[in-house]
Amino acid sequence: SVQNKNEDYVASFKGSDFSLKDMDNNIINQNSFDGPLTAIFFGFTHCPDVCPMTLNKMDIVLSKLNKENENLKFFFISVDPERDTPGVIKDYLSNFDNKFVGITGDPGKIFLLYKSWGVISKKIFLDNGDYNIDHSTPVILLKNGKYISMISHRDDIKKSIKIIKKYL
């Protein structure tokens, strides 16, 4: 995946107004990110490594936080809306114990959303005609819709818990 930008770089981005749909066809917009603590992660269901590892790590983190995680919302936002339909995302996220909310929609709107958070995403075409996506992988933490911190894919479970507990 693309090297994670440093935290100051990600913190310089503020998100943007948007309207997309989640995997259950509910409208998701910038107000959906309001609340005590929200985590957003941009990824895709065909990702061979970093996305499933990050989601698995966050699943364990949320389980270890147990009752403390009740105020935490976690959104998985697809950078591959062409393949990641609501049904595909719902099926993919059903592999995890915690309630991750999958978001997909119009590719142009998705592009603007991930750019607004400083996330980089690029299609890499393979010899067989298929493609992979190279993208940056921070788990971005928000409080009342505003950036407060991030978890890198390099942060282990213990460090990830410590980062989240700081804001719960």
Show the residue positions of the predicted features.
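Conserved helix-turn-beta segment immediately C-terminal to the redox Cys motif
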Residues: 36-37, 54-77
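Short, internal strand/loop/helix patches
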Residues: 90-136
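Extracytoplasmic/secreted envelope proteins and their assembly/folding machinery
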Residues: 55-62, 86, 90, 107, ...
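N-terminal "domain-start" segment that seeds a small globular fold
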Residues: 2-32, 56-57
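Short active-site neighborhood of thiol/selenol oxidoreductases, capturing the structured segment around
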Residues: 30-54, 58
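Thiol-/selenol-based redox modules, centered on thioredoxin-like
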Residues: 127-168
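Thiol-based oxidoreductase modules, predominantly thioredoxin-like and allied folds used
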Residues: 71-84, 99-108
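Short loop/turn microsegments at loop-to-beta-strand junctions
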Residues: 15-16, 38, 136-137
